[in-house]
Structures are given as structure tokens and as C-alpha cells.
Amino acid sequence: MSMTPREIVHELNRHIIGQDDAKRAVAIALRNRWRRMQLPAELRAEVTPKNILMIGPTGVGKTEIARRLAKLANAPFIKVEATKFTEVGYVGRDVESIIRDLADAALKMLREQEIVRVRHRAEDAAEDRILDALLPQARVSSFSEEAQQSSGDSNTRQLFRKRLREGQLDDKEIEIEVAESMGVDIAAPPGMEEMTNQLQSLFANMGKGKRKSRKLKVKEALKMVRDEEAGRLVNEEELKAKALEAVEQHGIVFIDEIDKVAKRGNVGGADVSREGVQRDLLPLIEGCTVNTKLGMVKTDHILFIASGAFHLSKPSDLVPELQGRLPIRVELKALTPEDFERILKEPHASLTEQYRELLKTEGLHIEFADEGLKRLAEIAFQVNEKTENIGARRLHTLLERLLEEVSFSAGDLASTHDETPIHIDAAYVNSHLGELAQNEDLSRYIL
């Protein structure tokens, strides 16, 4: 990850409006991972990541920042909800499964990268195997044994290879030997995922090396053989070692809904999924060793980013030790009407662009006028103020309601409007949403 903080923020700005403080914090944290790797080994071990707590109402961009960060980082990344975990000893998932999932994500990411790297070699090997299955039908008895042995360079083989690449043989059926799959689906009870994974690995290893002959169309066989050849070219042990290092040195964990496990006031009871979960998170964030399929993973240098709306609780309701392990606090601001308007216009693949392109597939063209988007933003803000504030997610509800009739009758409208676009202006928005927005009872249930 060699992007500078300024470049990271610039990339995040393409997708997320506002929230500059949060973007700067995650950009610095991400850049610090790269800076740490440039240090001498003895000093590198001492530099630990500064974990982040993002505080802000729902729908302002906390989760979206995490999603975009995952794509930018090119590092093992996992997003989890704190509410899915229970204290050790109770039925449910314990927090150590976060690191096991992160290890799985790292292995999957590196395997995909390695398969891309060996793709051309795998394709060549797969083509050779398909041609070996095809060519006995093309040979004639007058060929000598020597000629058959050198058929790899023969004109016939080259001709078949050309036709195979052009897709002319896709529907031809061949018989080919492929690895026998011993995958077994096991329904895991809550908290037993690790044991289930081990059982599945056991069954998979039992079937390793077994092969069976199958009749397939060339197109299906080529894909199956290509995947098999790519898997054969990938060194699994080397891959696991790389994945282990990637998790320990570059891993990022995003814990959403952290406010839902905060203890609110003096609530009695067992508090299984609240304070117990927080206390289980402490060693994970501080640094401990977790057993995974890659081996023992040290969590000392994994970056943790926690986020929560904190509507019904405060950050101070978290246990003090957990507060201390999340030293960087970032507050995300509630969205203004201007923010809503920018969200509709500016981001790459904005909501309006998505609807425009979706309807274009039916031959229907729609255009959003600036005053129409401004009015839509005002209504979104008003409804959020009057009812529950769900942030930018309100725009999804409003746009779906606004374009409901157009989406339903898109095919008919396309034939009547020909190439003339439908204009979504302020008058159109008012006629479809104005009354609903003004009536608080209606907007509470419909918008």
C-alpha cells in the first residue's frame, strides 16, 4: 500500500461525500502500515497500530468508508457486527472467530492473486488436456507411432487448438478424467464453525488424488480442467505462510455496531452479549495469539476500526479498558440538505446514475434536473428530521418511491417517448413526493 494519505482521501472522495475527519484518520492509519514496514525489524516490532473509534449517526458513511478502504488496502480485511458475538462459554460465536475469518479472507485473497499469476500456464495445460481427449477421434490409422507421438506439433493439433480458442468446439462432448470432489456440506450449529471447517477439510483430504471419468461439453470441461491445473500450480504451503504474514502485518478488522454492546446505565441481568463481549475483545485488540487453519496468528499489529451510532449509549459506556485501546476518536457529522444533493450528483456510480443506466436497458431515457435533485434532497432532510434519521439511506426509499411508476411501465413508456427523455424536475418531485413528505403520519410509514 504505497498511496499517500492525500491520495487515499482523494480516492474516498470519489465515493463518499463529506466526513473529512474520518477519511483523514483512516488514511493516516493505512499509511502508517506502510511506514512501519520500512522500519528496521527490531523497531518495527515495537510500533503498534493506533486503533480508531468512529462515532456518528446511522447512514452518514461509516460502513461505506470501511467498504471502500477494503478495496484500496489490498490487505486482508474483514467487517463484522459486534452484535453477532457472545461471551465465551455461551451459545454463539466467540470473538476469536473474527481472526479465523480474517485468516480465511487472507488465504482466499492471496489464492485468487496467485491463480491470476499462473492463469496463462494453467490455460495452456488445460488446452493440452482437452486436445488429448479430442484428438484420438481426429487421428487416422495410417499415422505411424512416431507421428502420433509428435502430434503436439502437428498441423491437426494446431488446427484443433485454433478452433478450441475460437469457441467452435464448445458444444462438442468429450470424456475426460477430472479430480473427484469430496466436498461435504455440513450445517453448523452456532459457535461450532471451526469444528465444521475441520470436518470439511478432513473429507476433502480423504478424496484427494481420486479421479473419475466424466462426459462433459468442451466449454465446461475446459473451465473445470483450467481450475484444476491452476490449483496444481499453486504452492499451498507457501501460500499459507504468505497469508499468515499478511494477516499479522497488514490485517484490518472493522467492527460495526460497537455501541450495541455498550452497557446502558445500571441495567441488571446476565448481560451475555454486552460487557462480556467487550471484555473478550480486549485481549484481541491489545494483542494475543489465536489458533487458525494457517497456524498461530498474533494480533499485535492488526488494525481495529470500531464504529457505532451511539444513539442510546455513549462512548463512555464502553468498559474503560476498551476505550483505552481505541485511542483515536472520530466524529462523523449528520448530513445536511447540501450533502444530500451532493450525494445524488457527485459520487462515482451515484444513485441517480444507477437508475438512469438501469432504465436505459429498457430503452427509456430519464434526466434529473438540478432543481429536481435539490428538492429531493430537501425532502430527504425533512423526513429524516420529522421521523427517524436514517441518513443517506433515506434517498434509496425516496428515489424508489419517486420512480416507482416509471420503473413499472418502463417498456411502455420507452415506446411512447421514443428517444425523448423524461425530465425529473422540482414539479415532478413535488407531485410524487410532496404530499407524502408534508403528512407526518404517511411519511412515517411510507417514506
UniProtKB/Swiss-Prot annotation:
GO MF entries: ATP binding; ATP hydrolysis activity; peptidase activity; proteasome-activating activity
Subcellular location: Cytoplasm
Taxonomic superkingdom: Bacteria
GO cellular component term, pick one: HslUV protease complex
Main location: cytoplasm
Binding site residues for ATP: I17, G59, V60, G61, K62, T63, E64, D256, E321, R393
UniProt cross-references to Pfam families, sorted A to Z: AAA (PF00004), AAA_2 (PF07724)
Biological process according to GO: protein unfolding; proteolysis involved in protein catabolic process
Keywords for the protein's UniProt record, in alphabetical order: ATP-binding, Chaperone, Cytoplasm, Nucleotide-binding
Functional summary from the UniProt entry: ATPase subunit of a proteasome-like degradation complex; this subunit has chaperone activity. The binding of ATP and its subsequent hydrolysis by HslU are essential for unfolding of protein substrates subsequently hydrolyzed by HslV. HslU recognizes the N-terminal part of its protein substrates and unfolds these before they are guided to HslV for hydrolysis.
Oligomeric form and interacting partners: A double ring-shaped homohexamer of HslV is capped on each side by a ring-shaped HslU homohexamer. The assembly of the HslU/HslV complex is dependent on binding of ATP.
Family per record: Belongs to the ClpX chaperone family. HslU subfamily.
This protein's name: ATP-dependent protease ATPase subunit HslU
Taxonomic lineage of the native organism: Bacteria, Pseudomonadati, Pseudomonadota, Gammaproteobacteria, Pseudomonadales
Name of the coding gene: hslU
